[in-house]
């Protein structure tokens, strides 16, 4: 979560059990290659074609003639699936094998002789959502010289409907995921060159037509690129790994997995498409049915310097609020060489408990949490090594060398998880603490920019032939999975100074992600609207922070201070839009405020959480402006069985005290009890609620939370 001292500078395969296996075949003559393959979903038809160096997908309305693909735009030179060598020569392919079990699944094996490469490609339409997922893996034939891969494409897709608008997410630290509208007459290029998913853009794009929505999402946590180029009757999308300073050498028997890419044409508006995306992403999460506990986090009450005394004082407070987990954030550790008065950022990497801060060890706090029926959580930054770390001096070769340079002695460094010994160090140190202390929740932070990454000199070629970021992130995903295997009940939360590394791949290996270091509720409301276009609410972790107003220091990104508008209920309702927690000096709250928060925690746990985490989301208004000077904002979540829903309504600067919100997704003939928190109950049929529920909010910067349940 902490943004300071920044460094500058393989994707999970979709399940394909329905596909019958096929044996590798010899490379046939070119005239044996099938020209195209067609995949069909309820709202889309996809034509896959091999065009020399390019493997393309043309997407149509299911009623359109398939042969319109013959008029599709020809792929340009940079549409090649793979380019090799300093000259970036496109690789020409032919089909070595194919297997299409049905209209939803396709496997291709493509082969090239010069260079000696094979591409294994799987297209699978998800039966539950109709979304198409492509997985691509490159491997060396086994005969011939090593191949220097310098560019790849994980997707090239042509859309054959006129596009009304292109929607994407852009931002900065503490101002993530602001909804943007792309140009209608020029190419849109989204990318990261920071060595992580990035604050600047999300690897997400939505394109709207009068009758449909197209979605594209790249599942990758390192440098990526996603481009959209409007055409007279549609658009072309291309993307995958960013080829900026990319080089990956494949020797005989070596393999490179490209990022998984999700794509789809879906009938209806953006809400309908987002619901299907959320369904897919929820199913891809670890332990998708496990509730995310309401947590109390120590960062804002005791930023960077927790102690046994301060934590033990807050544990019973968290319990009285109704929280389910208590997480000790950064600062609990020392280095192998002993105690230090240096700040939390300088001491990361060795992961030894500080006995100055915790004289009886962390186990004392863990036991106190158990005694109060709380899970115990602990913050780590496994990849980032502080300048005081002993392991850094013992093994400088384990650190990323950006631009070929060793990290400066007084700066933080990044442990290269592509190095097996470095990976093992991180695994051993983290799991030792998790086991010894009894940790149920691990918060995994990453306060660094990696650029293109880099290898230390003198490492074996078997390592340095790999692109350093590819090696690092494949190691990261393995480390996430290994820790969860060792501790199957553990909740794994990811963070990168907020939403700096928030993507569909890192969240295929973790449960939840801290979405922003932004402490202001008004700005955070806009961040929720944007983030929840690309990610389901269950993975979006947020806290009640700045209460009472002015109690929290502003981030450097908000030099003018935190916008203090919004009462306590408003701030609670914003934080309850995803997974929910508290990080504030609750021990100093007035009794009435404490009771208000405790009541909201109980309501969230018992009623709101299962609907928000697993239901369909409808954005009922436009994204509110980050400065709060907008009209109204509203989000409606409805359970999959259509028997329950929750409405969050926020009055911003609007002079109007009332709005009517249509609540879709309910059973027309069923009768529902609808009530705002602490308000009277109204009984209405689903058809009446679909026509509109009147909501009154008396003052600006107040909110209402309505619960709707079958009578």
Language-model features and meaning:
Residues 686-711:
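C-terminal beta-strand-rich structural cap/linker in extracellular carbohydrate-active enzymes
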Residues 248-266, 702-708:
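Short Pro-Gly-centered flexible turn/kink motifs
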Residues 386, 391-424, 470-587:
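Glycan-recognition surfaces
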Residues 33-50, 55-229, 244, 671, ...:
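Polysaccharide-binding surfaces and accessory modules of carbohydrate-active proteins
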Residues 20-38:
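C-terminal segment of N-terminal export signals and the immediately downstream linker at the start
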């Amino acid at each position: 979560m902490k943004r300071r001292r920044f460094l500058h500078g393989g994707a999970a395969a979709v399940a394909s059990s329905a596909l019958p296996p096929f044996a590798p075949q010899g490379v046939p003559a070119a005239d044996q290659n099938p020209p195209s393959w067609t995949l069909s979903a309820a709202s889309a038809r996809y034509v896959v074609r091999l065009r020399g160096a390019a493997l393309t997908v043309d997407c149509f309305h299911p009623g359109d003639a398939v042969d319109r693909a013959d008029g599709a735009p020809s792929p340009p030179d940079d549409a090649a699936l793979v380019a090799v060598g300093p000259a970036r020569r496109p690789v020409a392919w032919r089909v070595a094998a194919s297997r299409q079990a049905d209209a939803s699944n396709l496997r291709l094996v493509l082969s090239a002789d010069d260079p000696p490469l094979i591409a294994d490609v799987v297209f699978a339409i998800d039966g539950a959502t109709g979304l198409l997922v492509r997985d691509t893996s490159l491997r060396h034939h086994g005969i011939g010289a090593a191949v220097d891969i310098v560019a790849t494409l994980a997707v090239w897709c042509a859309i054959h409907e006129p596009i009304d608008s292109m929607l994407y997410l852009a931002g900065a630290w503490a101002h993530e995921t602001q909804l943007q509208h792309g140009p209608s007459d020029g190419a849109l290029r989204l990318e990261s060159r920071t060595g992580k998913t990035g604050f600047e853009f999300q690897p997400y794009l939505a394109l709207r037509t009068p009758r449909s929505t197209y979605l594209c999402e790249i599942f990758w946590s390192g440098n990526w690129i996603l481009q959209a180029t409007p055409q007279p009757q549609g658009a072309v999308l291309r993307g995958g790994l960013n080829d900026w300073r990319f080089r990956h050498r494949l020797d005989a028997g070596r393999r490179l997995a490209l990022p998984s890419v999700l794509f789809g044409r879906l009938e209806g508006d953006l809400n309908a498409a987002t619901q299907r995306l959320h369904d897919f992403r929820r199913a891809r999460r670890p332990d998708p049915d496990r509730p995310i506990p309401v947590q109390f986090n120590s960062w804002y009450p005791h930023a960077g310097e927790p102690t046994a005394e301060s934590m033990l004082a807050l544990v019973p407070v968290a319990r009285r609020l109704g929280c389910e987990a208590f997480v000790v954030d950064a600062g609990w550790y020392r280095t192998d060489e002993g105690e230090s008065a240096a700040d939390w950022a300088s001491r990361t990497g060795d992961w030894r408990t500080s006995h100055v801060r915790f004289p009886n060890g962390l186990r004392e706090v863990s036991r106190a949490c158990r005694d109060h029926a709380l899970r115990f959580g602990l913050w780590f930054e496994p990849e980032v090594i502080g300048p005081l770390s002993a392991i850094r001096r013992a093994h400088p070769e384990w650190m990323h060398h950006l631009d070929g340079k060793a990290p400066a002695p007084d700066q933080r460094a990044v442990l290269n998880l592509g190095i097996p010994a470095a990976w093992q160090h991180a695994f051993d140190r983290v799991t030792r603490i998790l086991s010894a202390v009894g940790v149920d929740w691990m918060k995994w932070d990453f306060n660094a920019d990696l650029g293109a990454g880099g290898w230390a000199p003198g490492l074996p070629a078997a390592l340095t032939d790999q692109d350093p970021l590819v090696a690092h992130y494949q190691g990261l995903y393995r480390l996430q999975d290994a820790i969860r295997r060792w501790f199957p009940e553990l909740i794994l939360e990811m963070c990168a100074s907020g939403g700096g590394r928030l993507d569909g791949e890192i969240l295929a290996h973790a449960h939840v992600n801290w979405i922003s270091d932004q402490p202001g509720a008004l700005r955070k409301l806009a961040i929720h609207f944007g983030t929840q276009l690309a990610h389901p609410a269950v993975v979006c972790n947020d806290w009640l922070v700045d209460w009472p107003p002015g109690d929290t220091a502003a981030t450097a990104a908000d030099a003018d201070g935190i916008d203090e508008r919004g009462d306590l209920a408003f701030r609670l309702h914003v934080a309850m839009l995803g997974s929910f927690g508290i990080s504030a000096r609750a021990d100093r709250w007035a009794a009435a405020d404490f009771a208000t928060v405790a009541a909201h925690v109980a309501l969230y746990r018992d009623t709101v959480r299962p609907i928000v985490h697993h239901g369909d989301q409808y954005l009922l208004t436009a994204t509110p402006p980050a400065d709060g000077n907008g009209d109204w904002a509203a989000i409606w979540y409805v359970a999959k069985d259509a028997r329950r829903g929750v409405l969050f309504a926020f009055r911003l600067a609007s002079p109007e005290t009332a709005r009517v919100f249509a609540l879709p997704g309910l059973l027309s003939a069923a009768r529902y009890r609808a009530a705002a928190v602490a308000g009277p109950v109204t009984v209405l049929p689903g058809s009446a609620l679909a026509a509109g529920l009147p909501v009154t909010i008396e003052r600006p910067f107040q909110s209402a939370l309505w619960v709707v349940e079958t009578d």
